[in-house]
Amino acid sequence: MHELSYATSILNSILEVLKEQESLGKKVTGVSEINLEIGDLTLISFEQLKFAFEVIAENTLCKNAVLNTEMIKPKISCLNCGFLGILEVTDELEAKCPKCGSMNVRIKGGKEFNIKNAIIEFDD
């Protein structure tokens, strides 16, 4: 379950930002939302990621944070027929050109895992 390591990475990154904000004299009261970009080729189960995050964030300022995700589709270029487009990811992890069926392709993207932004709540 590699989702736990991803969830831990998210939590540690956000807690580091909260620590920085507090060192600037700001009173952080919580995090309400964390927005992620996740590539389809990471094969991360978003439901498992959310569950793992909820468990490890339980006693932190992130305990009420909602995780949102934007899934990033990989792009494919066929070296055989010149097709450029989106690669539809299946469980088989075959990278075939949807136009000619060739496996002589290049894949760009789809492996992203980024924290796009987070909504941090402060005490005025």
Curated annotation (Swiss-Prot):
Annotated Zn(2+) binding sites: C78, C81, C97, C100
Residues annotated to bind Ni(2+) = H2
Q: Which InterPro entries match?
A: HypA/HybF (IPR000688)
The molecular function GO annotations come to:
nickel cation binding; zinc ion binding
Q: Which domain of life is it from?
A: Archaea
Alphabetical list of Pfam families matching this protein: HypA
What GO biological process terms are annotated to this protein in UniProt?
A: protein maturation; protein modification process
| UniProt entry keywords in alphabetical sequence | Metal-binding, Nickel, Zinc
Q: What does this protein do?
A: Involved in the maturation of [NiFe] hydrogenases. Required for nickel insertion into the metal center of the hydrogenase.
Would you identify the family this protein belongs to, as annotated? Belongs to the HypA/HybF family.
HAMAP family for the chain: HypA_HybF
- What is this protein's record name? Hydrogenase maturation factor HypA
Lineage, top ranks:
Archaea, Methanobacteriati, Methanobacteriota, Methanomada group, Methanococci
Q: Give me the gene this protein comes from.
A: hypA
